[in-house]
Amino acid sequence: MGEVGTFALVALVGLLTFAFVASAVSGVARGIHWLSNINMVLAIVLAVFVFVLGPTVLILNLLPTTIADYSAQLATMSGRTAASAGDDTASWLSSWTIFYWAWWVSWTPFVGMFLARISRGRTIRQFVVGVIVIPTSVSLVWFAVFGGSAIGVQRDGTDVASQSSTEGQLFGMLDHLPLAGVSTVLVMVLVALFFVSGADAASLVMGTLSERGTRHPSKRIVVFWGTLTGGTAALILWTGGTDALQGLQTMTIIAAAPFLLVMIGLCVSLYRDVSRDPLIVGPTKESEHERVSDTL
């Protein structure tokens, strides 16, 4: 199969833009909620499929081992820089650790506000469990299933690691499992749905910011931001190809770097706010004294 042309990619961007704009306009309780549930069901189906038809015993053996190794090396790996090893490690760190963290910084305004929107009424404990503990646990299992399957295929003599991209490695691994055609289609559907469910949340947040923090931005504002986002990607892709789009991603991350200072300020603000919350601090000495005086 030959390489997909620019026109086909632009058409795909247009189709996905229409999908996430329609989802965003329908609101959190309808389209976004519906798509998110479909995403999770299909992801579970895919993970179970790979776990059952792949090297199940190897995956079960890798799961506790990798989690223990990850926990033991987390601090070391978090502080690792290019000075710790050679050029290959430096290249990997720049493309994964640094780039990936910077990418999440650029998504912080959208993800943070959207999580705050859907978490209204939850306790801090519920928020931490739902946003940090559960996603982290699911991610560990997910990487163990797919990483273990790829390792199993590699051990069997098929060199999937030599594929030029991570996408090629994924599809190369799926090709060695039964029903490869079905799983390949399922992966592509999942990628599209996860993109739509992320972009519709971003459109909704930009609409909220444009209307001074309202919880229900007008549909025309949401459509405007969604169309502008998709149109910008399509225009850059049409004029400069995938290289230009990657350049835009890099520029976005660089522009988002100053937001690290805002994130630090938000952490300090959250700590101060929580430390003064009456439900956490409890009654002050003054209020206790007043209560004792009233009793007497």
Whereabouts are the PLM-identified features?
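Hydrophobic, membrane-embedded alpha-helices of multi-pass small-molecule transporters
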Residues: 6-23, 56-57, 75-83, 87-119, ...
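C-terminal transmembrane helix pair
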Residues: 132, 137-141, 181-205, 209-268
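Hydrophobic alpha-helical segments and their helix-loop junctions in multi-pass secondary transporters
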Residues: 44-83, 146-151, 263-276
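Membrane-interface interhelical connector segments
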Residues: 72-90, 147-181
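Transmembrane alpha-helical segments of multi-pass small-molecule transport proteins
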Residues: 2-26, 45-46, 101-113, 219-234, ...
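Transmembrane helix-loop junctions in multi-pass membrane proteins
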Residues: 20-32, 52-64, 87-91, 111-124, ...
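Helix-loop-helix connectors at the membrane interface of multi-pass transporters/channels
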Residues: 1-10, 43-49, 112-137, 199-225
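Membrane-interface loop-to-helix entry segments
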Residues: 25-53, 62-72, 129-135, 249-262
